[in-house]
Amino acid sequence: MALETVTLEHLPASHKVYVALFRGVKNAAFLHQQLLARNPEFEYAFIDASVVVSRLQLLSAVFKATSTAVNGALRTPNVHSEIVCTMSSSNNIADAYRRYGISPSTQDLVVVKVTFPGEDGAEPLTQDQIWEHLKTNVEGEAVSITDEQISIATDVPKVRKYYKLNGLKWLDDIQDEKVKQKEMESLVIGAMALRGV
């Protein structure tokens, strides 16, 4: 099963986080339309994988958005849209959806689902139910969500543009690609953390 359960410290045990990565998605337009129609069966954070640099970046956004939801301070309709917005370094929600969320042209897709008991006491979906829904509705190859798989999908020029990392000569001068990747990851996470400050 390519849907991974992730445990994030300092979140209530009742909140479960599931993540998956799909490559070569053929029906991104359909999935995008489901979000626009606010179809409750498609309440996921659909993130364009081309703007994700690492698992740490992704999980930082998930943690921040879920903490915001737990504290009742969401700025968007739900925790999943909050995750997409938290990926951004700016406060512009529409811009965050456009840059970081799924679009009809998305090729590689990160999917995040956060479950928790409903206010009416309803049981949240299980990992198997979520995976079955994703397998049925996402036309793409599910792969493990590792830094290696993420880096294959990352569009570095796009990331540098969105996070305003162009023109950093010291970053360009780093010869070791792993070191450069780690430095870029730190800059991106820092930009996300400083959003709105």
Swiss-Prot record:
SUPFAM superfamilies: PF0523-like. It is found in: Nucleus; Chromosome, Telomere. Pfam families: CGI-121. The keyword Phosphoprotein does not apply. Keywords: Activator, Chromosome, Nucleus, Telomere, Transcription, Transcription regulation, tRNA processing. It comes from the Eukaryota. Its main location: nucleus. PANTHER family: CGI-121 FAMILY MEMBER, EKC_KEOPS COMPLEX SUBUNIT TPRKB. Component of the EKC/KEOPS complex that is required for the formation of a threonylcarbamoyl group on adenosine at position 37 (t(6)A37) in tRNAs that read codons beginning with adenine. The complex is probably involved in the transfer of the threonylcarbamoyl moiety of threonylcarbamoyl-AMP (TC-AMP) to the N6 group of A37. CGI121 acts as an allosteric effector that regulates the t(6)A activity of the complex. The EKC/KEOPS complex also promotes both telomere uncapping and telomere elongation. The complex is required for efficient recruitment of transcriptional coactivators. Belongs to the CGI121/TPRKB family. This is EKC/KEOPS complex subunit CGI121.
